[in-house]
Each structure stands twice: as structure tokens, then as C-alpha cells.
Amino acid sequence: MSTPAGGAGGPEAMSRRQLLRHTAWFGAAVVLTVTGGEVISHIGGTPTATAIAQDPHALRFVQISDSHLGFTGSANTDVTGSFSRAIDQVNALGSRPDFVMHTGDLTHLSTSAQFDQVRQMLRGLRAGAVFTVPGEHDSIDDHGQRYRAMFGTGTQGDGWYSFDIKGVHVIALVNTLALEKLGHLGTDQLEFVRNDVAGLSADTPLVVFSHIPLFAMYPAWGWGTDDATQALSHLRRFSSVTCLNGHVHQLFTKTEGNVTFHSATTTAYPLPHPGQGPGPVPLTLPAGRLGAALGIRDVTYRTGRHTLAIRDQKLA
Amino acid sequence: MRQLGTTLVLPAVAAGIVILAGCGGPAGAVPGTAVPGTAVPAPVSAGQAMPGMSMLPAGAPGAAAGPAAPVATDAVSIQNFAFSPATVTIRTGTTLTWTNRDQDPHTVSAMSGAFHSPTLNTGQSYQHTFTTPGRFDYLCTIHPFMTATVVVAP
């Protein structure tokens, strides 16, 4: 298991040179905001996200997650409506994103009808491309076969893949198939990661997507990946690695050495903070409060300037 | 080995929803529902982006009974991401009924493969008749941190 949240593995785990480069690329321009101009967290960041977005050479992508189409509980009686609003919000961003990544739990029950619905809705996104990784709700009882039939084109193994775009190397992992309490990647996928980055320069910024966190956010609820440490060991030589996950339905950020993890929120319903309550039980918020717990995330990376901005926006 | 007597029954949907509604929003106002002694790693940043969440532990008191003494019953509730009772002791030939009272889907799946429910959505039940003595550990395949045991006496 990787280092527990808040534990060891701090800056001493990386060389000073790595730390400086990492800080220059990431720490200097992490921007977490919400819509309406209300700034939640703003760390350094001379270049604002808006300025970066106007740079034609900038990479801009959006992460959406955990739409759970088919969920009907009181925590959100209209997940289709909120996912639709999330798509509208992506389409209303200042510039068309290079790609949109849905980090899993597209559906609630892995039914063909739910997969059809989510694919249809994703077609409404105005973006250069749309990618997905599966959540455990997308692979119920069939090891992800229905998911891959619809979203697995061009992927390897059980649905993992990678690509390069505007100087950034993107890796999309599948850690929801061989669940044993925690998320699991497996030897084939670990080998894929090792080979995938073998030829890359250590200066290449890496962005890694998975559904379940690659760090130990709260293992008692399955919020971690048991062999993530092995995958991350192949990424240790890179100056900057950004891991973006879903699954936990809430924002959370953590840095371990050269790797920064960002859990995204959901478009469906919130879950409790780690350990609050008996389990990851969907939260039914007071009337009018749900929208503030849901959202989308847009990320911008400007080549050359080595700046990256992450903005988390509440669902409008 | 698939055993006889496995059926899926679909009553009690309304009952499940009523129970869930009862432990939803209003539960946040009930004092003393927070679980003591659980370590909560503080969000490094942006935890504030979820106003109101911290005041909603929303747990049904008592449903998260830990590893308690074995209980003789023929009904197991799936609630708050736990099988309750966590261990049941029955006689050979008994039919157990599991009912999902969560908003999330769950399964009842023996680690040995001896039985395996379909996906149980809110309010759905699953029955299995135990025809051989022994100890059966099982879990939810969607949330495999949910584990429990059936002990079948001769």
C-alpha cells in the first residue's frame, strides 16, 4: 500500500532538484476555484487560469466523474439532470477542451441501457476527444465486458491505454476489476506502465487517471489501490506526476514526493468524509445544497512555461 | 457448486426507501451519531468546497455493529455498507434472506463460490438455503471491504 494520507513520503523522498522542478511546474500554479469567482484555494500562480486558457499552445482538459446514471436514491433523485448540467457547464467553458476524461462509475448498475444512455450523453460534449476509465459500478458481475464493448476500442488489456498530447503524457488505468478490499492494477497492467514510460524523458509531465485513488485515502472503505506503489515506482524519476481519480465523490489533494493526487467530486451525489459515519453511504443533503457538492474540474497546462492549473467548479 | 433454493425476491422496495429516507438528511441533526475514535485524515486542501458535508455523518445508530457475537436469525440486513448481523449461526436446511436497505447496490457472494446473488438494488432481497454444514465467508463483490460469515450447524 502506498503511504497513508498525511504520513511519510514528503519532500525528503525526492531529490532537491526534483523538488525544485516539481514546484516550478506544479506548486507555483495550483489554482482551485469554484464558479462565481469564489476562490477556495489559490496557491501562488502568477499566471491565472484565464490567461493560460487563452494560450493556443496550452493543453486544456476536463475531468468529470461518478455520474452513476441509474441511481435513484434520495441523495439525488435526478442524476441524469445533474450530469446533463455538468455537460452543459463543460461546453460553456471559455475554450473548447482538448479532451474530456470521465473517471468512472459512468453507470450505477452496468446495465446495457445505462451504458447506452451515458454514451449518448457524452456525445453532447464539445471537446477534441472524450475518454473514460471504468469504475466498479461499470463492471458489476462481468469483469467489465459490457463497459469494454462500448468504451474499450483502442485500449489494451482490460481497458488501459496511454497517449501524448501537447507535451503531456497521459496514462489511463483500470483498477476496479480485481477488487480485494482495495483497488488493484495487477501484474499485466504494472508491466504496461513500466514499458509505457520507459522511453520518456524525465521532464515529460505525466497525468495518470484512475477511478479508485492510487493513494491510501481511506483503505477501510476501499479507498486505495493495493499495488499502486509498484506502479508509482515506475514514475518516480519523472519531475512531475499528477494523478487524478474519482470514486470518493469529494475533493481531496495530497502530495507524496514528485506525485500529486487530486480526487475529484461527482456529478451525482456526495459521500461522507473518510471515516465519518459507518460507511461510504450516499449523503442526502438539505434542500438546495446538493449542487454545491457536485462539480467538474478543468485542468490547463502551458507548454514551456511549465505551469499547470487545476480548477474545481461547483455544478451550476 | 450451485445449491438449490436460490431465489431473487423483489418485495419491500418501499420499505427500504422509507428506512433510507429516515436516516438521510434529518440524521445530520441527531446528536451523537458520529462514530467516536475514527481517524479522519484532514483534507489537505479544498475540503471546504463541500459546505455542509462535515455536519452530516448520516449514520443510522446501531447499524454499524462491529464483530458481534454470532446471532441466530434467518434475516440479514444490508445497510450502511455492512451485513448485519455480521455473523449468523443457523441449522442445516435453513433459508437465509438478505435485504439491501442501502441506496447503493450490493451482492451476497460466498468467497468459496458456494452461492452468489445477482446485483441487489435498493429494497431487493436474495434467499439461499444452506443444505450442508460449515462456515461460509461471503462479501459484496462491488464493495469487497464488506465481509460477513454464515455458520451452518449440523
Q: What do the PLM-derived regions correspond to, one by one?
A:
Chain A
Residues 64-65, 100-104, 131-136, 209-210, ...:
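Active-site neighborhood of phospho(di)ester-bond hydrolases with catalytic His/Asp-centered motifs
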Residues 1-18:
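N-terminal secretory signal peptides
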Residues 71-73, 106-107, 176-185, 215-220:
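Surface-exposed cleft-lining segments at the edges of enzyme active sites
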Residues 201-217:
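Short acidic, glycine-rich surface-loop motifs adjacent to enzyme active sites
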Residues 69, 107-108, 138, 214, ...:
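Short active-site segment of divalent metal-dependent hydrolases/proteases
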Residues 22, 29, 38, 42-116, ...:
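N-terminal active-site segment of His-dependent metallophosphoesterases
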Residues 52, 111-205, 227-242, 254-265, ...:
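Extended active-site neighborhood of metal-dependent phosphoesterases/phosphodiesterases
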Residues 175, 209-214, 246-248, 312-313:
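Short, well-ordered beta-to-alpha junction loops that form the rim of enzyme active sites
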